[in-house]
Amino acid sequence: MSKQQAPNTTGIGTADLQWHSDETPYSPRFDDIYYAPTHGAEESTHVFLEGINAPACWQQRPHYTLAETGFGTGLNFLLTLDLWLATAPAHGRLHYIAVEAYPMDQAALARAHAPFAWLAPHSAALVQAWPPAVAGFHQRSLAQGRVTLTLLFGPAASMLAQLSATVDGWYLDGFAPSRNPEMWSDTLFAQLSRLSRLGTRLASFTVAGTVKRGLRAQGFTLHKAPGFGQKRECLRGVLENPLPHKPNIPPWYAPPQRSEPVSSVAIIGAGIAGAACAYACRRAGLQVTLFERHAQPGAEASGNPSGLFSPRLTAGVSLDGRFHAAAYFHALDLYAQLAQHTPEIYHPGRGLLQMAESEADVQRLQQALFHSAWPPQHAQWWDAATASQQLGTPLPRGGLWHAQAGALNPSVLCAALLADVTAHYQTEIVRLAPQPEGWTLHTAQRHYGTFDAVVIAAGATAPLLYPEAEIPNTAVQGQLSILPAANPLNQHALVFGGYLTPPYQDEQGQLCQVLGSTYRPWDDLSDCSWSECQPEAHQLVWQQLNETLPQLGQQWLGPARQGRAALRAAMKDHFPLFGPLINPSAYRTNYATLYQGKRVSLAKPAVYIDGLYLIGGLGSRGLLTAPLFGACMAALLSGGPLPLEADLWCAVHPARLLVRSLKKPPL
């Protein structure tokens, strides 16, 4: 029996479990078992899979979206996955969404699955992909990309209120209404209705009167069916009377609605943003063509010889902290999958110390650790003595230790992501042209296309590709120094205001370390001298190292003579840009009175440039944020559930700066 754990500060707890003598998992919190001890799989199949008319319900659909309230052990998911893989169309896609307020850990999941031996391969895949108990959305890709599992960790009603999806079938499987009333509230039923379409089916084990009344009030037609075993009845239903619901996203940020599904997509840029997007879209079944002006992927800002992949924790629960937590755990999962076949994406050595930059920063980082409530295998505090011992150099202060973070080889990573993507290198796109049937892409000599959609992932030069969109990112030059490795035995990365990577082997076989980096605004994109390294920039980062960590800095005789410079795409509010590109003139007309506080219900829907999308403004955090944005773009184009909470979608939306300006009274 595991000890009961208190909810963490993000509002999510973990499952408190006891195990009966027959190995049935039991929840003391809800005084109930997770499944029937002798016939759990049979009962779940009867109540839930047969309740939504599986497999017939998905056999004529290229995409099927199923959602569950109460993931629990994941037994319903495993049974659904097993049946879907055996009966779905050859090119079908399954999207499975599940809410869970008290997730189990990996060991408990595996133990709960042990009685169902025929599900062992699916169980192993689920356990391996299982995220830590951190609040928010966690999307995982299974079955070679044919199945996405989107886990919503947190209270059911509030998590579903953040969801953007169209659900075809529901499993209502929380603990009994008398033991877990929050899972069966009118607020939750309203979210079920909002997320459903005409004809959406539902199935549940309970026929409680409050549940039936709540669902009928939301437009569902219900009927009782014979229960399983000693249970007399179970519940089945169909949404036959959809009700109008207030959107969970303001109209000026509402996702675009396409009349026809996207089949082909062109992606401009083979840095980490474009590569991650291409990978995710390819796995979603889209026809992907990538264009890159250089001869190989990862040639500009994503071409550094070693790049740090590390989380960003914030002192308090915030949009910033929640977004970067979601991005970190998504990227960690993707990189683990890639490393199974291409271990070279990681440089040797794992683990990163984010050292406090001052005594005040000690308190800030400790508060960030407390509010994140991350498990220690992902974040823990090291005092100065421990940090100094582990990193092999005297450090004035402790910091946050991230055991799973580390140094990546960005160009190898980009190449791995693009391994099966059709790509045109040394092909500089200079103009995008909308056509009645899509988009054509033009170089100075020829054109390509048409494509249903275009994703601009061109970094700092993105605004030049379609000026009408008024993409608001700015360019910032960054320069890093490449030094001979001072301590080859130190295998950990260090962030101290600047950063120092662990040693890696360069193309000549020499052990080197990267010391970074500078930030310099670059206003003139026609001035290509940004790629030239400046001695004063080398001096600046070396001086910062020596002032902060003099004993470490003294291991080098002076500033580096080698390095690398590139342009980053940055944003004034330090948040990235993601999503459909807007028609700015239509926004200025339609939302001219936003500053008057007009009600949301009276506002016109967003006007987008049809089929044109952006991943940009990633700054120096591309390795952290690009994988999540790739998955989001794949969902947006293919019609899957968006793995981003609604308020985070609004926070990264390309229209946000314009909308903020329109909300201010004119001078």
UniProtKB/Swiss-Prot annotation:
Q: Which PANTHER family match?
A: SARCOSINE DEHYDROGENASE-RELATED, TRNA 5-METHYLAMINOMETHYL-2-THIOURIDINE BIOSYNTHESIS BIFUNCTIONAL PROTEIN MNMC
Positions of the region FAD-dependent cmnm(5)s(2)U34 oxidoreductase? 268-667
Ranges where the record places region tRNA (mnm(5)s(2)U34)-methyltransferase: 1-240
Task: State its role.
Answer: Catalyzes the last two steps in the biosynthesis of 5-methylaminomethyl-2-thiouridine (mnm(5)s(2)U) at the wobble position (U34) in tRNA. Catalyzes the FAD-dependent demodification of cmnm(5)s(2)U34 to nm(5)s(2)U34, followed by the transfer of a methyl group from S-adenosyl-L-methionine to nm(5)s(2)U34, to form mnm(5)s(2)U34.
Q: Where in the cell is it found?
A: Cytoplasm
* Keywords for the protein's UniProt record, in alphabetical order: Cytoplasm, FAD, Flavoprotein, Methyltransferase, Multifunctional enzyme, Oxidoreductase, S-adenosyl-L-methionine, Transferase, tRNA processing
What reaction(s) does this enzyme catalyze? Answer: 5-aminomethyl-2-thiouridine(34) in tRNA + S-adenosyl-L-methionine = 5-methylaminomethyl-2-thiouridine(34) in tRNA + S-adenosyl-L-homocysteine + H(+)
Tell me if Methyltransferase is a UniProt keyword of this record.
Answer: yes
Q: Which SUPFAM superfamilies match?
A: FAD/NAD(P)-binding domain
Question: This protein is called what?
Answer: tRNA 5-methylaminomethyl-2-thiouridine biosynthesis bifunctional protein MnmC
The protein's required cofactor(s) are namely: FAD
Q: Which family does it belong to?
A: In the N-terminal section; belongs to the methyltransferase superfamily. tRNA (mnm(5)s(2)U34)-methyltransferase family.
